A protein has these predicted regions:
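Glycine-rich phosphate-binding loop of actin/hexokinase-like ATP-binding domains
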Residues: 1-34
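Alpha-helical scaffold segments in soluble metabolic enzymes
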Residues: 18-22, 43-50, 121, 148-151, ...
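Short helix-capping/linker segments at secondary-structure and domain boundaries
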Residues: 23-28, 96-99, 153-163
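A contiguous, well-structured pocket-lining segment that forms one wall/lid of small-molecule binding clefts
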Residues: 25-105, 116-124
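Glycine-rich beta-strand-to-loop/alpha-helix junction loops that act as flexible
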Residues: 104-115, 145
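Acidic, glycine-enriched active-site microenvironments
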Residues: 1, 5, 108, 115-121
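Glycine-rich phosphate-binding/hydrolytic loop that grips phosphoryl groups
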Residues: 131-182
Length: 182
């Protein structure tokens, strides 16, 4: 129960946002409204879930560059948003379910927390309570930048920032260097 764990599953809301920019003049699917009005293409979803990248999601970290949205080509804006949203929720739930017995709720941050469709899918697939970090008094738009600031301070103080249970390193270690431009 006192073990520190972490996962970075890669795309978060990025694939949905990319789909919206490619298929419309919108930057994101506000509240997941387009996904809600679309229909998941189960054949495409099953095929992409069987793909190597998805199988790689058992690794500690995936990057947005590990994914693309070409699998949704030919779908309507709404059906593509629904299919990509379901794919994203499956990736997130795959990571969560590895540790599900270790926690009772999920605290979410970043833009995806405002996508009701995505959050409802994750809650349904994990059967866990989803909490928007804003409700705990934090601004969910800045958690990642604050995390990097925190890690920079720990690194500056020569404190560990990487652990076997978070990144798979053999021994806990610090990281990074400070450079000065004169």
């Amino acid at each position: 129960k006192n073990n520190l764990i972490s996962e970075d599953i890669g795309p978060g809301n990025c694939l949905i946002d990319k789909w919206m920019r490619v298929m419309s003049k919108k930057d994101f699917d506000k509240n997941g409204d387009f996904a809600k009005s679309g229909k998941v293409d189960q054949n495409i979803l099953n095929k992409i879930l069987d793909h190597e990248v998805y199988k790689k999601s058992n690794s500690k970290s995936l990057d947005i560059k590990d994914f693309d949205i070409t699998f949704a080509k030919g779908l309507t804006l709404e059906d593509g948003s629904a299919t990509i949203s379901d794919f994203t929720s499956q990736l997130i739930c795959n990571a969560i379910n590895k540790y599900k017995d270790n926690f009772l709720k999920i605290i979410v941050c970043g833009g995806g927390r405002k996508n009701n469709y995505l959050m409802n899918r994750i809650a349904k697939l994990t059967k866990l309570k989803i909490i928007d970090i804003d409700k705990l008094g934090f601004d969910g738009n800045f958690i990642e930048s604050q995390t990097f600031a925190y890690l920079a301070i720990r690194s500056h103080l020569k404190k560990n920032i990487s652990f076997p249970s978070t990144t798979g390193v053999k021994l806990a270690s610090t990281g990074g260097e400070i450079f000065k431009n004169f």
